[in-house]
Design a protein with these regions (language model features):
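Phosphate-end processing signature that detects enzymes handling 5′-triphosphorylated RNA
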Residues: 1-127
Length: 127
């Protein structure tokens, strides 16, 4: 397993539009795709009371988000932990993560996250 921290400060704005409009925008503004299209799959974890979801919806800090994620292959190879507080956001990515409950909880505990979390939401989309 390989740990990577992404603490780059950024603000993202996301738009949804059709393939036709995407091609038009790329052409009209002479934009280039940085990455080829890919399938992103994520499984989000939460408590039985959906604590992480409610904290996020209410904008409460500190809060965390836990997910496993994969790209193009149906495998969930990355464990991602996002911690947000009132002054900072931290994203920890553990690459080549082989999902099993023992390693999952061991990794969370190493970052000070303790509790019982279950799979709550699976998301799949083309990026």
């Amino acid at each position: 397993m390989q740990k990577k921290e992404d603490n780059i400060k950024r603000h993202e704005i996301k738009f949804v539009f059709s393939d036709k409009n995407e091609n038009k925008l790329l052409k009209n503004y002479e934009l280039k795709k940085i990455f080829p299209d890919r399938i992103v799959e994520s499984i989000y974890f939460d408590t039985s009371e959906f604590k992480f979801f409610h904290l996020s919806e209410e904008g409460v800090t500190p809060r965390i988000k836990i997910r496993i994620r994969g790209y193009n292959n149906g495998l969930f190879e990355n464990l991602e932990i996002k911690k947000t507080n009132s002054y900072d956001r931290q994203k920890i990515v553990i690459k080549k993560f082989n999902y099993n409950l023992t390693d999952f909880y061991k990794n969370l505990k190493s970052f000070g996250i303790d509790g019982v979390f279950t799979k709550k939401l699976k998301v799949k989309y083309k990026r």
